[in-house]
C-alpha cells in the first residue's frame, strides 16, 4: 500500500493489478470475478493488506487436481504413478523435510518441469495418503507432520479434529493436504532453468524484468504506511509473521554425521563466495607441488630399477637354461678316451698260422634294433629280448613332458600357497625359478605347459557341459 503525493487515496496491488481506494468504494463497475478479491482486500483497508496464507490457496484450489500425490508406507514412500519406491534413509529423504517445512524443494524443480507438474499461484498442492496405520485403528488419527502446521493456521476450518477426506470407513487410509510455497532459492532456480532454455541469451535486464513480474504475480501486497503507535506495529508484525515450522525431535548425531554436515556447509559457503572479489584469501605458500614432483620422480626411479632387475634375472635364466637342459653327470655315459699312439708297423703273421676269411655282416630287421634296451642309470645295457605286452615303452621326450606337467601342477599349488602367505609376485617368481633350475628345466617352459594344461581343462569342461545339455534335450 502506497500514499500518492500526500493525498488521501491509496494504491493496492493484488495479482499484478493496481487499484486505488476509490475503486474499492465504487464497486459498481467491478466484474463479478474480481468482486471476491476486492471485497476481501476492502475488509482490511482500515488496517492493512494481509498476505495470502497457505490455507487460503488450498481452499481456493480445493476442487482442482493436486500437484503431487504422496503415499507414505511403513518402510518406504512413493509418489503417484511411480514404478519404484524411496526409503526413509535414502538420498531422497530431503523431500520429506521440505514437505514438513511446507517449502518447494529447489533440487526437484527441473524434475517437476519435465514432468508437467501443475503449479497453483506459484505453489504446489500435495495430497498425502498415510498407509502406515492398520485398518483396525481408531478413527482419531494422529495428523501428518506436514499438515499439523496447516491445521494450526486454519482456524476457520470446521474440520479440525480429523483429517480431510476421512470417511467412516475404517479401511480407507487417512488423507492430508498441504501446500508448498516458493522460496527465493526456487525463484533463482526457475530463472536459471529459463535462461538455459534460451541458451543463455537473455540479458540481465530481461531477467530482472521477468523476476519483477513473477514477484508481482505471486507475492502479497506491500504495506508501506508507518504505524501510529506501538500496539498498531505489534498488530502489523503479528499478522505479517509466518507461523514457525513444527518442532522436530532430532536424534543425537554422531561425530561422522556432524563432520559430514560441516563439510557440506563449508562447500556451499565456498561455492557462494567463489566470485567474491572482496573476499580475503590468506596467502600461505606451501611446497606441495614440489613434493608431488619429487614423489613422481621417486616412483619412476623405483619402476626403472625393478625393470632392470627383471631384465638381469631373465638374462641369468637364459644363460642357465642350456646348462640345466643337459642330463646329470651320472646319466651321461663316459666316452672312451682316445690316446695318441704312434703308428705301429704291421707285421704279418707267420705262415704256419691260418687266418680265416672275413665273414659278411648280417642284416637284421628294423624292429630288432628297437628291441635293444637303452642303458640304465648305472651305464650298463639292460638284457635284450622281447618286451612284455603289459609294459609299454616310453620315449625320453614323453618322459620329460610328463615330468614337466607334474612340475607345472606342483608349481601352481606352490604359487597359491605362497600367495596366501602374503608373498609378492617377485618373490614367488624367484622361488619357482630356483626350483625349476634344481629340477633340470626352466620356469618359462613349466609355465607354458601349465597354461596349456589350464586351457585343456577348460576345453574339457566346456565339452562336458555341451554333452550334458545335449543329453538333457
Curated annotation (Swiss-Prot):
GO cellular component: cytoplasm; cytosol; medial cortex septin ring; nucleus; SAGA complex
Swiss-Prot/TrEMBL keywords: Cytoplasm, Nucleus, Transcription, Transcription regulation
GO annotation (BP), single: septin ring organization
Molecular function in Gene Ontology: transcription coactivator activity
Cell compartments where the protein resides: Nucleus; Cytoplasm
Mutant phenotype after disruption: Leads to decreased growth at high temperature and sensitivity to several drugs like hydroxyurea, caffeine, canavanine and rapamycin; as well as to raffinose.
Domain of life assignment: Eukaryota
Family matches, as InterPro entries: Spt20, Spt20-like_SEP
Compositional bias ranges of the Polar residues kind: 335-344
Region (Disordered): 134-179, 304-385
Name of one Pfam family that matches: Spt20_SEP
Compositionally skewed regions (Low complexity) per UniProt: 142-163, 304-327, 361-377
Subunit (UniProt): Component of the 1.8 MDa SAGA (Spt-Ada-Gcn5 acetyltransferase) complex, which is composed of 19 subunits tra1, spt7, taf5, ngg1/ada3, sgf73, spt20, spt8, taf12, taf6, hfi1/ada1, ubp8, gcn5, ada2, spt3, sgf29, taf10, taf9, sgf11 and sus1.
Family: Belongs to the SPT20 family.
Function: Component of the transcription coactivator SAGA complex. SAGA acts as a general cofactor required for essentially all RNA polymerase II transcription. At the promoters, SAGA is required for transcription pre-initiation complex (PIC) recruitment. It influences RNA polymerase II transcriptional activity through different activities such as TBP interaction (via core/TAF module) and promoter selectivity, interaction with transcription activators (via Tra1/SPT module), and chromatin modification through histone acetylation (via HAT module) and deubiquitination (via DUB module).
The protein, known as: SAGA complex subunit Spt20
Gene encoding the protein: spt20
